[in-house]
Design a protein with these regions (language model features):
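Well-ordered beta-sheet/strand-loop patches within structured domains
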Residues: 1-188
Length: 188
């Protein structure tokens, strides 16, 4: 029988450039019950370890779905049409949000991101990223000229995402993210 040798998609010398922390962010879920906490641990593990080559895009939804019990998810609170409902995979938006904040700090290209229909408690207003099928999905693209590595995990009641790669940005740069409330809408 003939043996076919296939070239590796990622070469060792490319991976050797992944040596610097480009951006990191953590959120707290100490008020979450066991089911929601389990969803955060499961979803973070599904994103953890992704390597993105230059120009490649990561979809939070594609990494984490399907949101089923068979895929390790539990029923927990989620937002749906302006209400709080129980849903399999409830809480995974905190994963998207934490990854979004790490991606902003790494200055990755944000291809797709939508906010929630209501305020969330784990980040300031406008700093969130919702997940609802492919309609509300976080997609980030590696706009660096070298590969990046995405690390995601929970420890205790903290969820963390860190993006690693080759740092090329000036060391003395300053990047600031501001959440400012410009008006309130009172619902009746």
């Amino acid at each position: 029988a003939a043996i076919t040798v296939k070239e590796a998609a990622v070469r060792e010398e490319q991976l050797a450039t992944i040596q610097d922390e480009l951006g990191s962010f953590s959120t707290d879920f100490s008020s979450s019950g066991d089911s929601r906490s389990g969803n955060l641990q499961n979803g973070a593990a599904k994103i953890n370890g992704h390597v993105l080559m230059p120009g490649e895009t990561l979809s939070g939804y594609e990494c984490m779905h399907p949101f089923t019990k068979e895929n390790g998810y539990f029923s927990a609170a989620a937002y749906e049409n302006g209400r709080v409902v129980d849903s399999i995979g409830g809480g995974v938006c905190q994963i998207s949000t934490t990854l979004y904040q790490a991606a902003l700090r790494a200055e990755l290209e944000i291809v797709q991101r939508q906010n929630h229909s209501m305020i969330v408690g784990y980040v300031k207003p406008s700093m969130d990223a919702a997940t609802a099928g492919t309609v509300k999905d976080l997609k980030v693209t590696n706009n660096y000229s070298t590969p990046i590595y995405v690390e995601g995990y929970t420890k205790g009641r903290t969820l963390t995402f860190t993006i690693y790669g080759k740092e090329t940005r000036p060391a003395n740069r300053t990047v600031e993210f501001v959440s400012e409330t410009v008006s309130y809408t009172h619902l009746r």
